[in-house]
């Protein structure tokens, strides 16, 4: 029987931060927020027009975009050049710069129906494609795996590319494959659509996957996961979790949107809800998107809301937010609604930085007390 490591994690309270390194991780989160508050210096003139203020704020605190479907979109193009501009997609370097995007999570999700070895192989191909795209666009893009690397990329005038989320099927029911994908740069994994993370919630193997993700520094993405999976993940995970493309279910009942109770629980656990700019999930106008951001901020808190362009996934976007260049319009709308500059900087950059730093801290602490898990799904789930 493979050893089931850190079984004690399953009894941790969401907001109690109990456990062998939960207290330290929570202290690190609080320190991150304190550092951000202490270091914050306004960069815009409150007497100027909102759009002008938006550009000024974003020039210093760019957007960390939680979800881009660009890798899959590029697979179907015979040729592309993202540095000079690519009309066939919603995202290229000129538009990212115009929209003040400083970091971008590139989705490795696959079409439905791929599982087992086929899913693992297709994910490896996606990783290879992303690395090739970044390597061939050195003036605009740079791979990043940590908060520090993302900041370094921005300081060098590059847009940080973070790998993930990948679908849960990508690991092929193997923690060894999970570790291999991490070694190749994967930093976010979606916990849904597999037997160990289903409508019924996380199985024993699913919980062990999440613990191993914590040990490595792979963030859990809970967008599209069942309510039972979300709740259990908030209990088991020692790192903050992400919802890379979830808005408010109370405003728009899309299956990937979160109900109010889960938004509150996510905020209590210092997770991050990244609101997508898609008409299906948030509505047809920039005002609708701002309504969702207001709602999420009110329930989860300003430290638990982020942005997710969700461009290049084949879906319609709200008016005035058609592509990656349009973020200043959204920020101007929020400023017009009374959002403070401090809250805007958390929304665009600070919250993602906090989550990445916390995941790294948790991983380093976990690696001091546990070896790589040898658990097998057949042994834990039968």
What feature does the model see in each segment?
Residues 100-101, 186-188, 212-218, 236-242, ...:
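Glycine-enriched alpha-helix->loop->beta-strand junction motifs that scaffold or abut catalytic
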Residues 216, 223-226, 246, 276-277, ...:
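Glycoside hydrolase catalytic-domain context in secreted enzymes
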Residues 225-269:
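Aromatic-anchored, glycine/proline-accented short structural segments
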Residues 68-70, 224-227, 248, 313:
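Short, glycine/acidic-enriched loop or turn micro-motifs at the edges of active sites
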Residues 2-208, 253-382:
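N-terminal hydrophobic targeting/anchoring segments and the immediately downstream early-domain regions
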Residues 199-234, 240-244:
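Loop-centered beta-sheet repeat module
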């Amino acid at each position: 029987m493979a050893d089931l490591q850190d079984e004690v994690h399953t009894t941790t309270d969401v907001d109690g931060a109990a456990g062998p390194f939960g207290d330290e991780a929570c202290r690190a989160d609080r320190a991150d927020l304190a550092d951000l508050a202490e270091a914050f210096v306004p960069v815009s003139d409150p007497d100027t027009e909102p759009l002008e203020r938006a550009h000024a704020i974003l020039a210093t605190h760019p957007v960390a975009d939680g979800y881009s479907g660009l890798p899959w979109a590029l697979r179907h193009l015979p040729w592309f050049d993202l540095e000079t501009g690519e009309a066939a997609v919603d995202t290229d370097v000129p538009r990212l710069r115009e929209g003040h995007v400083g970091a971008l999570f590139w989705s490795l999700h696959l079409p439905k129906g791929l599982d087992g070895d086929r899913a693992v192989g297709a994910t490896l191909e996606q990783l290879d494609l992303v690395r090739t795209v970044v390597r061939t666009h050195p003036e605009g893009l740079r791979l990043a795996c940590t908060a520090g690397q993302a900041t370094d990329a921005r300081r060098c005038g590059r847009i940080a590319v973070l790998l993930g989320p990948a679908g849960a099927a990508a690991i092929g029911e193997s923690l060894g494959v999970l570790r291999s994908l991490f070694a190749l740069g994967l930093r976010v994994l979606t916990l849904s659509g597999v037997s160990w993370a289903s409508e019924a919630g996380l199985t024993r193997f699913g919980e062990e996957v999440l613990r191993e993700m914590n040990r490595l520094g792979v963030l859990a993405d809970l967008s599209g996961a069942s309510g039972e999976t979300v709740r259990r993940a908030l209990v088991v995970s020692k790192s903050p979790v992400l919802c890379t493309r979830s808005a408010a279910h109370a405003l728009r009942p899309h299956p990937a949107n979160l109900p109010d109770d889960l938004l509150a629980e996510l905020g209590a656990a210092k997770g991050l809800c990244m609101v997508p700019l898609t008409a299906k999930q948030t509505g047809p106008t920039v005002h609708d998107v701002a309504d969702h951001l207001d709602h999420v901020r009110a329930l989860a808190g300003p430290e638990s809301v982020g942005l997710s362009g969700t461009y290049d996934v084949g879906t319609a976007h709200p008016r005035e937010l058609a592509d990656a260049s349009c973020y200043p319009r959204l920020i101007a709308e929020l400023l017009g609604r009374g959002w403070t500059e401090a809250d805007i900087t958390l929304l665009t950059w600070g919250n993602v930085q906090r989550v990445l730093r916390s995941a790294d801290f948790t991983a380093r602490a976990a690696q001091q007390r546990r070896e790589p898990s040898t658990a097998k799904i057949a042994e834990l789930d039968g």
